[in-house]
Amino acid sequence: MKIRIGTRKSKLALWQANYVKDFLEKHWGVEVELVKITTTGDKITDVPLAKIGGKGLFVKEIEKALLEGSIDLAVHSLKDVPMVIPKGLKLGAITKRENPYDVLISRSGKKLYELPSGSVIGTSSLRRQVQIKKRRRDLKVEVLRGNVDTRMRKLKEGLYDAVILAYAGVKRMGYESEITEVLEDFIPAVGQGSLAIEIREGDKRIEELIKPLNNEESFLCAIAERTFLRRLEGGCQVPVGAFAKIENGTLKMKAFISDIEAERYIEGYREGNPEEAEKLGLSLAEELLKKGGEEILKEIYSSQ
């Protein structure tokens, strides 16, 4: 019996879906077909995601196909998956995380702190924008949408002096050698670097097939980060970030909430037992909300 994987049509999405397809074929000897689906986020390419609003812009149509039974599983970038999974579906596996950080690629080869004042930086994410402003208020941040190839082309055409992208996407699309700097002090997007495999609840057969793809450490980090973001009701339209990693048996997590201009930037840190990932994520969210995050979020949501 053929297994159908639902995926977006972009080059990066197909790389991700093929990664899962190759595994299933080699490991289990099953036949796998990719079903390419256009999502709302793919159709709207000229408007910042924060302006469109709404969650699940890159997954809704794929989830619908999964619920209807026209596909057997879906492969997403974990960072695109909304915090609340539709009834009847669940995350069956989260793959081993690629390098989770953001990277800077500049035309001049200069790092973030070396770029001349007034340099134009392209990024689509509010999370990245506020972290740039916090460090270099003298740089000009401009919205940049599109896939990795499109963003790299715009950089090379001179529309931007530098762009900030996720390391994972840059590597998967073959641009790793062009990285100027890995921004390890930037807090990445929730789930950045991992793939999420979404399945129907109760579909034991598919669940067994994808089980070996699940990475327990990445799964626990994802729970901590996603619990944090769910408490904040955050999506693409809010400047927040959370990052968890497990070192020597301890889950260490840092996160931030900021206003749009990075004038009020609230950070926090937690560490504890990885098995209490959900509790750690929730308590860090509560701490940041109490420290002024709640007020910031109210202002942002009311202005949208």
Swiss-Prot record:
Q: Which UniProt keywords apply?
A: Porphyrin biosynthesis, Transferase
- Keyword Cell division part of the UniProt annotation: no
Query: EC number(s) in its UniProt entry?
Result: 2.5.1.61
Alphabetical list of PROSITE patterns matching this protein? PORPHOBILINOGEN_DEAM
> What are the required cofactors?
dipyrromethane
Per its UniProt record, what CDD domains does this chain match?
PBP2_EcHMBS_like
- According to the UniProt record, what class of enzyme is this? transferase
Q: What is this protein called?
A: Porphobilinogen deaminase
- Source organism of this protein record: Aquifex aeolicus (strain VF5)
